């Protein structure tokens, strides 16, 4: 039986560069998004995802917050509690990220994982407020890894 830790994923250098820029923009330590991509890959393997589906999940993990970077709002990096208006504005970032992923030529699957990576099982997430099994497993896996 193959260990879920033993298989290290290989990531596209362009996506790693985008992830590094997003990590720096948000004030995360270097390699934050790569670690999340490795985590979702391990979880995808544990859930018996096909290699192609694991690749989509890895790609989504690397570009999940590109929408925040493209919004380029100072409050994202402020470290303070956001106002109601700022929170509402920030909730647009998954849709902006979905559009950016499309412009980059990433698959529709990656685009949708990026769009739904802030959805919650109880329907309180954003941008669409979908709930339960309406949220694809890949998006749920990314939500957990990103929160962890």
PLM features: what roles do these ranges have?
Residues 1-148:
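Histidine- and acidic-residue-rich, metal-dependent catalytic cores
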